[in-house]
């Protein structure tokens, strides 16, 4: 099958994004795994986010490329390819929400934070979030799908099914109904967490600014609060980028559902660009970590120097010293 120029460009860009996503997010996981200064509950949630982004590069993008080519396969195989992307997206959103709640607790109840948010509890929350993400992403398998309209399977008088009629052109819209994507996925599972995160970060900045205005604060407390503000800004930036990358796809889905006549004329390149933008969100986070966090930046440099450039140098904790900094200092 010969690809058109537009399809070939789309595939090439997807493969580039996949490579960058895998490399960058594996680096994030390795950094947290090798640096004691980065092994905090907050960063465990970021590792969960990075794991989802690695899976986007390894699986979701190849699946998306396969779906974009519109090959013919059985309905449920195509549905699985489509739903897998939804699982990873939902996991990313839940991980970002967990980070927001974690940062709010850190600045709202700083004296109780370490006893409330432990590594064990963080890992337990991550496990629950992934189970929920799979449940939400795989909901179309329970029946909320387009099988009746996408296939022409018939049950002859003898009770057998003509499997050749059950093949479907594997395109996302052919297997997942827009009613699910808009009402359940977007309005129910994507938009509410994003709005909750917006409220949480606004409250974080309000609480932090109010605390900074207290004249009786000692220098150490003021420094800790300033670090929390810096961390919150970085994490809010990640949430904002995630929203900007994913909202175009959901906007197109809304147009498809509510304005079907107009959606029929939508150019293919517009949908391809929206999909590319959504996948590009998986590349951004490691760049933000490296730019905004000294410990991540230092550890990235040490890992690359040792394992990529083969320079023999001992990998220390994020600041080049023993990992004795507080959890607040190693936040973004």
Curated annotation (Swiss-Prot):
Could you state a single Gene Ontology molecular function term? G protein-coupled receptor activity
Lipid tethering residues (S-palmitoyl cysteine): 310
**InterPro entries linked to this entry:** Adeno_A2B_rcpt, Adenosn_rcpt, GPCR_Rhodpsn, GPCR_Rhodpsn_7TM
**Which PROSITE patterns does the record cross-reference, listed alphabetically?**
G_PROTEIN_RECEP_F1_1, G_PROTEIN_RECEP_F1_2
State if Glycoprotein is listed as a keyword. Answer: yes
Q: Provide the residues annotated with a glycan attachment (glycosylation).
A: 152, 162
Q: Where are the transmembrane segments?
A: 9-33, 44-67, 79-101, 122-144, 178-202, 235-258, 267-290
GO BP of this protein: adenylate cyclase-activating G protein-coupled receptor signaling pathway; vasodilation
- Tell me the disulfide pairings in this chain: 78-170
Q: How does it sit in the membrane?
A: Multi-pass membrane protein
Q: Which family does it belong to?
A: Belongs to the G-protein coupled receptor 1 family.
According to UniProt, the name of this protein is Adenosine receptor A2b
The gene name on file is ADORA2B
């Amino acid at each position: 099958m010969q690809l058109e120029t537009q399809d070939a460009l789309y595939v090439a860009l997807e493969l580039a994004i996949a490579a960058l996503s895998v490399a960058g997010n594996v680096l994030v996981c390795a950094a947290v795994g090798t640096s004691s200064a980065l092994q905090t509950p907050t960063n465990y949630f970021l590792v969960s986010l990075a794991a989802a982004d690695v899976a986007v590069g390894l699986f979701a993008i190849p699946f998306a490329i396969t779906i974009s080519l519109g090959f013919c396969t059985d309905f449920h195989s195509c549905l699985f390819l489509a739903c897998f992307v939804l699982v990873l997206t939902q996991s990313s959103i839940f991980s970002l929400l967990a980070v927001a709640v974690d940062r709010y607790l850190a600045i709202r109840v700083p004296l109780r934070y370490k006893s409330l948010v432990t590594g064990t509890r963080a890992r337990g929350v991550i496990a629950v979030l992934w189970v929920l993400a799979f449940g939400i992403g795989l909901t179309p398998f329970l029946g909320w799908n387009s099988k009746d309209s996408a296939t022409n399977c018939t049950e002859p008088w003898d009770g057998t099914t003509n499997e050749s009629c059950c093949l479907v052109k594997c395109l996302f819209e052919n297997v997942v109904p827009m009613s699910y994507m808009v009402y359940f996925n977007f309005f129910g599972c994507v938009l509410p967490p994003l709005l909750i995160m917006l409220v949480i970060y606004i409250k974080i900045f309000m609480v932090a600014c109010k605390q900074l205005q207290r004249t009786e604060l000692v220098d150490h407390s003021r420094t800790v609060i300033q670090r929390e503000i810096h961390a919150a800004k970085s994490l809010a930036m990640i949430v904002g980028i995630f929203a900007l990358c994913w909202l175009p796809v959901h906007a197109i889905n809304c147009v498809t559902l509510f304005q079907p006549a107009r959606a029929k004329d939508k150019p293919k390149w517009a949908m391809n660009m929206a999909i590319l933008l959504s996948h590009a969100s998986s590349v951004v986070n490691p760049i933000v970590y490296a730019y905004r966090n000294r410990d991540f930046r230092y550890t990235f440099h040490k890992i690359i120097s040792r394992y990529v450039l083969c320079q023999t140098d001992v990998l220390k904790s994020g600041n080049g010293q023993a990992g004795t900094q507080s959890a607040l200092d190693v936040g973004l």
